[in-house]
Every structure is written in structure tokens, then in C-alpha cells.
Amino acid sequence: MKVSVLITLAVLGVMFVWASAAELEERGSDHRDSPAWLKSMERIFQSEERECRKMFGGCSVHSDCCAHLGCKPTLKYCAWDGTFGK
């Protein structure tokens, strides 16, 4: 009984190592290509609107913050103003 449990655990360990190595090899090729992919995605999502401060960015007036964000008067940072929509 003990031997069969040990053999089962050893087989599961070998399968885990084999699967991890295969996943690492597969992800490794994607990892080399990812910086170019990320740069292309950055260009796609760049806003054509005016530059605005994102969440928790510093601000002095409400118009400094992006849509649906408002400038908090005490600590001067952009936070959600409680609105939804476009």
C-alpha cells in the first residue's frame, strides 16, 4: 500500500514538472514578443482627447481630471465623482 502511494506521488510529481516545463517553454516565446505587442496596444488605446489626470493623479481643479473623476479639495487628487456613462 505504501509503495503504491509513493509511486503515485512520484508519477504526479513528474507529470507536474513536465507540464510546467511545457507551459514555460510555450510562454517563453510569447514573452519575447510581448514588448512589441504591448507597444502596439499602447498606440491603439492612446486618447486623442486632451491629456487628463487619471485616478489618484494630482490636480488643482476638476477640469484637470479625466471623465467621471473630480478633484478632491483636501488632498488634491483625482477620484471617482460618482457618475456613470460616456
Curated annotation (Swiss-Prot):
Q: Which GO molecular function entries does the Swiss-Prot or TrEMBL record give?
A: ion channel inhibitor activity; toxin activity
Subcellular location per UniProt equals: Secreted
Q: Which residues form the signal peptide?
A: 1-21
Propeptide at 22-50
Q: Which GO terms describe its cellular component?
A: extracellular region
Expression tissues = Expressed by the venom gland.
Q: Which cysteines are joined by disulfide bonds?
A: C52-C66, C59-C71, C65-C78
Chief location bin:
secreted
The answer to whether the entry has keyword rRNA processing is no
Keywords of this entry = Disulfide bond, Ion channel impairing toxin, Knottin, Secreted, Signal, Toxin
Organism domain of life: Eukaryota
User: How does the entry describe the domains?
Assistant: The presence of a 'disulfide through disulfide knot' structurally defines this protein as a knottin.
Q: What does this protein do?
A: Probable ion channel inhibitor.
Into which family does the record put it? Belongs to the neurotoxin 10 (Hwtx-1) family. 28 (Jztx-11) subfamily.
Protein's name according to its UniProt entry? Kappa-theraphotoxin-Cg1c
- Which organism's genome codes for this protein? Chilobrachys guangxiensis
